[in-house]
């Protein structure tokens, strides 16, 4: 077993690229239409993306403080553990591993193949093998070098931003102001009302998730006291500007009633640009593949650090804590999580059911934001960066997360509750086993 610790090798730009690259994923290709349908007017659609991004800032402030107080790998698991609840910390990691981390790899890999299928016909079985090959390729990349993986992540993040910049540039040139003056749609509630704006903001929520992924790797980040706050808040502002400009130009490119009813808003909007026309679909398919490739790469890179942290505490399979003696990466954790992701590729029906675990993951985030209150009561709590206006920021972080929990519960109440029961029913016995084993190992040492 490799016994050495992971080293701090990641600088600010690599960390920023991971945060932005994880956040800007396939969701934005459909969320503009969903937000437009919920908000009901072009201006409220744009405003929803602005406010949706601003709401995330308090959450990133909480993560920034916690990550500088506990600059180690593991994110939510570490924060809940230090807040005084090892069982909750374990359950958060348990749920993440089985219901979020590995399945997300399969979902993204299959999404890349789906977009590839837009360009050329692909046999379904062959497509699954291509998806598996993508996961294996990124496993090898991130297993061999954290610096090499970070360099690739920086390049792919730049590559995924370029097409959006092109869309924004073309959109400004072909922008039609009359689309903002056209009659509004009959969206949720009274059009233009406060409730419609809230609905629009809620619809942006998933587009802004992913920035806190870098907290999984805090133990490998140089100067975390400065790097983490800058990367977390900076990535939020960058994504906010990108999404707001996209929403603005797309709302100005096509009639709003068509936008609000579009399942592929970016692709449909680009067909209104004469320079692209029928090639818009190809452009979007290629862009989507680049975007999802970046997200898949970042997930293969950061997610295994959670199980690594749990294994180091003797609360997970010991092999997950192995560090490669030459490459200084959590090699076994990367391999096994990737292997589970490949398994899910070939069990697609099971993967679709795992979406119902979203309620559990949202509630886990709420608990993490609340953990800062208990952490601040500890005598040994000494963060290198503190959240400004702590009471207000923490309240906003918890409240915005609870709203997401509520909306997720409304989407699938019974399946969500069943999944919560599954996590507890399987997680608590597993925790009892590893906690007992951990005590025995500590007694022997």
Swiss-Prot record:
GO MF terms held by the record: L-amino acid transmembrane transporter activity
GO biological process: amino acid transmembrane transport; fructoselysine catabolic process
Gene Ontology, cellular component aspect: plasma membrane
Pfam family for this entry, one: AA_permease_2
Gene induction: Induced by fructoselysine. Makes part of the frl operon with FrlB, FrlC, FrlD and FrlR.
Primary subcellular site in the record, as a coarse category: membrane
Catalytic activity of the protein: N(6)-(D-fructosyl)-L-lysine(in) = N(6)-(D-fructosyl)-L-lysine(out); N(6)-(D-psicosyl)-L-lysine(in) = N(6)-(D-psicosyl)-L-lysine(out)
Keyword tags: Amino-acid transport, Cell inner membrane, Cell membrane, Membrane, Transmembrane, Transmembrane helix, Transport
Membrane topology: Multi-pass membrane protein
Transmembrane among keywords: yes
Superkingdom of source: Bacteria
Pathway: Carbohydrate metabolism; fructoselysine degradation
Keyword Protein biosynthesis recorded: no
Subcellular localization, as worded in the UniProt entry: Cell inner membrane
Transmembrane segments annotated in the record for this chain: 10-30, 38-58, 93-113, 121-141, 155-175, 181-201, 236-256, 273-293, 334-354, 355-375, 389-410, 417-435
Disruption phenotype: Cells lacking this gene are unable to grow on fructoselysine or psicoselysine, where they do grow on glucose.
Function per UniProt: Is likely involved in the transport of fructoselysine and psicoselysine to the cytoplasm, where they are degraded.
Protein family per UniProt: Belongs to the amino acid-polyamine-organocation (APC) superfamily.
Protein name: Probable fructoselysine/psicoselysine transporter FrlA
Originating gene: frlA
């Amino acid at each position: 077993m490799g016994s050495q610790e992971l080293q701090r090798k990641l600088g600010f730009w690599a960390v920023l690229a991971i945060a932005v690259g994880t956040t800007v994923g396939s969701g934005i290709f459909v969320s503009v239409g969903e937000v437009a349908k919920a908000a009901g007017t072009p201006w409220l659609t744009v405003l929803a993306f602005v406010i949706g991004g601003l709401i995330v800032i308090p959450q990133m402030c909480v993560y920034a403080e916690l990550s500088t107080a506990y600059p180690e790998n593991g994110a939510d698991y570490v924060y809940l553990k230090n807040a005084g609840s090892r069982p909750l910390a374990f359950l958060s990691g348990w749920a993440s591993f089985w219901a979020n981390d590995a399945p997300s790899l399969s979902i993204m890999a299959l999404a890349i193949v789906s977009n590839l299928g837009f360009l050329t016909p692909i046999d379904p079985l062959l497509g699954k093998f291509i998806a598996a090959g993508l996961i294996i390729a990124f496993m090898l990349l991130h297993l061999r070098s954290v610096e090499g993986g970070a360099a690739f992540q920086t390049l792919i993040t730049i590559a995924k931003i370029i097409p959006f910049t092109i869309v924004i540039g073309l959109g400004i040139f072909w922008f039609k102001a009359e689309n903002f003056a056209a009659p509004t749609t009959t969206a949720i509630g009274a059009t233009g009302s406060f409730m419609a704006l809230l609905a629009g903001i809620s619809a942006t929520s998933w587009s802004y998730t992913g920035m806190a992924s870098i907290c999984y790797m805090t133990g490998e980040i140089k100067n975390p006291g400065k790097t983490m706050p800058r990367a977390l808040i900076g990535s939020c502002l960058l994504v906010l500007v990108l999404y707001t400009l996209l929403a603005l130009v797309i709302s100005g490119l096509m009639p709003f009633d068509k936008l609000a009813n579009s399942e592929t808003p970016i692709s449909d909007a680009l067909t209104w640009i004469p320079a692209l026309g029928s090639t818009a679909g190809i452009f979007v398919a290629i862009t989507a593949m680049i975007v999802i490739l970046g997200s898949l790469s970042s997930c293969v890179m950061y997610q295994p650090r959670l199980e690594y942290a749990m294994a180091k505490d003797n609360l997970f399979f010991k092999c997950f804590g192995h560090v490669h003696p030459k490459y200084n990466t959590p090699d076994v954790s990367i391999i096994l999580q990737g292997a589970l992701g490949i398994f899910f590729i070939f069990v697609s029906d099971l993967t679709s059911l795992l979406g119902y675990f979203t309620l559990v993951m949202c509630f886990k985030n709420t608990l993490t934001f609340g953990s800062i209150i208990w952490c601040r009561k500890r005598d040994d709590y000494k963060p290198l960066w503190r959240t400004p206006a702590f009471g207000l920021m923490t309240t906003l972080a918890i409240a915005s997360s609870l709203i997401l929990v509520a909306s997720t519960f409304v989407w699938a109440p019974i399946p969500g509750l069943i999944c919560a029961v599954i996590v507890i029913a399987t997680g608590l016995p597993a925790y009892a086993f590893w906690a007992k084993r951990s005590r025995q190992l500590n007694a022997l040492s």
